């Protein structure tokens, strides 16, 4: 089987493509971290170094070279002390704090896409902490909105030999698929202990699973029998790969499934995300339009209130006219409120001096003629 192409080969074929983000989930003890370690070494050996992110704040040591480590940003034990939390609460709070800066992580991934074709993301051991938390949803949706994102559910094959336990694992995988709505791959880990062929047979052959259930006589087995009918549709479209994280077997087949899942993302999931983005942008545009219309209505009512009384020949002023002519209106108000309204400002001082001078000359001539008589 063909190995994943190196970053240089992808550049030669027409420029770098967005890296595929592999979001590794699984129950505690299923071997997620060991799987990521083996996956990292495999990709390095193929000349395709991945970009690795550790999202487990409670891990003591990371057995792989992490490009981004949540422990460098959030101190798990300090969070527990400061907020008085237990182990799970500390992990959730640490993830919440880290999610507030995930936009910076997205920028780092964008910068690294020239050199890395894959982004490996190791999640906390307690699967529900990431899967059902707000921060887990934020991180998953942020990745899926920009890059091909594939959920890899790591399952402990050695602990799933019991049909009831197997069904519990499948139900959890189904719930994650339903919540994330992303391409999904079930990695049946620890095939070095027991081969995963029995699980594949149970998924493909309903009667074989029923025969295994007939050995169980509990109420749970009856419930499992009913659920197996419901999950038939789920099994038909599920990608399953048997892997040994210890020996490194099954990784070639895994990357064949990853390539198929990436194509599925580009074909089905990306158009859906683009449609959701356009729908959100349209809703925001409609909201802004409605706010503008309400503002225009409010401004129109102000314009009506500033109009003159009925019967007046003066035009009604628009609010913008009030702003532009504010200085003129103030001057008119000052003239109307002046204390010298009773003075005729058209009569100048010069017009008063001429008749007063004529009266003075007439009085002087009269006195002169009176003396000479």
Curated annotation (Swiss-Prot):
It is found in: Cytoplasm; Nucleus. The record marks 88 as: Stabilizes the phosphate intermediate. The modification Phosphoserine is found at residues 301, 312, 314, 338. Pfam families: ATP_bind_1. The modification Phosphothreonine is found at residues 328, 340. Residues 330-342 have a biased composition (Acidic residues). Belongs to the GPN-loop GTPase family. Small GTPase required for proper nuclear import of RNA polymerase II (RNAPII). May act at an RNAP assembly step prior to nuclear import. Forms an interface between the RNA polymerase II enzyme and chaperone/scaffolding proteins, suggesting that it is required to connect RNA polymerase II to regulators of protein complex formation. May be involved in nuclear localization of XPA. Heterodimer with GPN3. Binds to RNA polymerase II (RNAPII). Interacts directly with RNAPII subunits RPB4 and RPB7 and the CTD of RPB1. Interacts with XPA. This is GPN-loop GTPase 1. It comes from Bos taurus (Bovine). The lineage of its organism: Eukaryota, Metazoa, Chordata, Craniata, Vertebrata.
